[in-house]
């Protein structure tokens, strides 16, 4: 592993969010409380050695080490964006022990059946921690709860969401995932539905596993596709891949001149897997729905089956079944899935579909099927008619519900909708049909503005044609404040790899990876 990969691994492995007051205070209180209960007995607690390691002074020294690194603790959302190099060796025994105790204790406190003890010494500890580390008072919102003494256990929804936010922010670290596996191996009752007194906790845990799976699945695909086509130098090593901002084709094209020679460590799953990739991969994802079409050998098919199906078949407290009747109804016909047409190319009687689902059939492994590269224009026009932007024949109409917004907001809504559709279907072979969709959205925007100002379409067109027009949408790209998309830039094929960002289409996330 080169030096840059080690530095990136060190950055991703450091946990500033773990060392908020509530977490390590609870660990310290739990350990000291167990030790105090056995003071009168001859036998001493087995946690004495642990108390010596997780001592208050050691934690204080660790906080001082974090304080020296000149971070910007302006909010929780800015924690993953730090760029300062860390020199703290997180792979030592103290660090791993801290994380293990923190998670074991927090998970035990969240779903415990016993009530909180009245004589809880946490208030005094809270005050001492706040006086010892005053630099965290104005920099972390979580400290406001500590100052007012409102923190007890994680019973409120806000505190529970804070924990899962912390888990979700750090699901890309190898050491964290390894520790998380150990926690659920030791605490197997966490995966039993009867263990939870409130189903809300089970739903939150299931959502966390869902996000974990989505992140690992996308990172795995990107890592190995890029590795196969030897396009590692196109990526920026310092740029991480997350689930809300996929690798954009623009970044890849702009980084061609930079010629980066190293690839960041994207995923622990991808890092521990070795295989060769042949053929084409068609991958479409929209939130929880997945579509995977692979034209490859037996080796990669077995690999996908092992890493995808086995992970989804975890007993998370709710059934993970397969709607076989729905799949059988699609065997002899073409069907639409996530806006793309699945063509029945070579159907056989002994054809087997390997699929797993959370709630409905969402993950398909097709053999003998292919994704059509043609955009389903009629289906898209039908979806626009459902949104009341046109009729069933494709004639544009006004959107009365959007007339309450100002003119700039209306134009931004239509331009963003058009831009998302262009990004989502930019890999299609019939890209010229996007002009029909563009015509519908443009004149629907004009009619909405005319309906708002109670004027004619001709006068509205004369007034706003400088901001929204066919020529500006095709040729210009955000020039002079015009809403536009550079179609030529999107459609130029400099590589065989298409990596488009996640686009929001009718309040749904979608991602499409297409290899010619």
UniProtKB/Swiss-Prot annotation:
It is found in: Plastid, Chloroplast. One of its GO terms (molecular function) is RNA binding. GO terms for cellular component: chloroplast. It comes from the Eukaryota. GO terms for biological process: mRNA processing; RNA splicing; tRNA processing. Usually encoded in the trnK tRNA gene intron. Probably assists in splicing its own and other chloroplast group II introns. This is Maturase K. It comes from Chara globularis (Fragile stonewort). The gene is matK.
């Amino acid at each position: 592993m080169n030096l840059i990969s080690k530095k990136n691994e060190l950055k991703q492995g450091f946990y500033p969010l773990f060392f908020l007051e509530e977490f390590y205070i609870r660990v310290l209180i739990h350990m000291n409380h167990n030790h105090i209960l056995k003071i009168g007995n001859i036998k001493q607690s087995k946690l004495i050695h642990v108390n010596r390691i997780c001592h208050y002074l050691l934690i204080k020294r660790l906080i001082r080490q974090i304080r020296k690194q000149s971070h910007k603790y302006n909010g929780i959302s800015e924690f993953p964006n730090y760029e300062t190099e860390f020199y703290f060796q997180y792979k030592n025994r103290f660090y791993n022990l801290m994380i293990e105790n923190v998670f074991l204790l927090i998970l035990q406190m969240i779903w415990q059946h016993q009530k909180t003890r009245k004589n809880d010494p946490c208030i005094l500890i809270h005050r001492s921690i706040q006086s010892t580390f005053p630099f965290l008072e104005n920099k972390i919102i979580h400290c406001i709860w500590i100052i007012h003494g409102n923190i007890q256990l994680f019973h409120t929804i806000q505190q529970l969401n804070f924990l899962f936010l912390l888990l979700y922010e750090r699901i890309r670290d190898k050491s964290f995932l390894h520790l998380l596996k150990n926690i659920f191996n030791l605490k197997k009752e966490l995966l039993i539905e009867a263990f939870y007194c409130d189903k809300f906790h089970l739903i939150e845990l299931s959502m966390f596993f869902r996000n974990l799976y989505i992140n690992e699945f996308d990172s795995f695909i990107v890592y190995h596709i890029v590795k196969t086509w030897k396009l590692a130098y196109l990526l920026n090593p310092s740029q991480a891949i997350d689930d809300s901002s996929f690798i954009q084709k623009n970044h890849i094209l702009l980084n061609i001149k930079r010629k980066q020679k190293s690839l960041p460590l994207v995923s622990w799953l991808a890092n521990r897997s070795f295989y060769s990739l042949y053929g084409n991969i068609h991958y479409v994802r929209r939130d929880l729905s997945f579509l995977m079409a692979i034209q490859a050998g037996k080796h990669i098919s077995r690999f996908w089956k092992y890493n995808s199906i086995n992970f989804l078949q975890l007993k998370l407290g709710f059934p993970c079944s397969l709607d076989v009747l729905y799949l059988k109804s699609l065997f002899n016909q073409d069907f639409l899935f996530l806006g793309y047409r699945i063509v029945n190319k070579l159907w056989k009687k002994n054809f087997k579909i390997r699929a797993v689902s959370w709630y409905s059939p969402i993950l398909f492994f097709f053999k003998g099927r292919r994704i059509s590269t043609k955009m389903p224009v009629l289906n898209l026009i039908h979806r626009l008619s459902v949104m009341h932007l046109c009729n069933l024949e494709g004639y544009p109409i006004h959107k009365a519900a959007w007339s309450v917004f100002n003119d700039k907001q209306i134009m931004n809504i239509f331009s963003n909708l058009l831009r998302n559709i262009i990004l989502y279907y930019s890999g299609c072979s019939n890209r010229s049909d996007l002009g029909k969709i563009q015509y519908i959205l443009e004149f629907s925007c004009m009619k909405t503005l005319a309906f708002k100002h109670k004027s004619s379409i001709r006068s509205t067109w004369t007034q706003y044609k400088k901001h929204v027009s066919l020529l500006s949408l095709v040729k210009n790209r955000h020039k002079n404040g015009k809403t536009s998309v550079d179609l030529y830039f999107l459609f130029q094929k400099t590589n065989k790899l298409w990596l488009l960002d996640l686009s929001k289409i009718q309040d749904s996330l979608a991602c499409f990876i297409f290899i010619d």
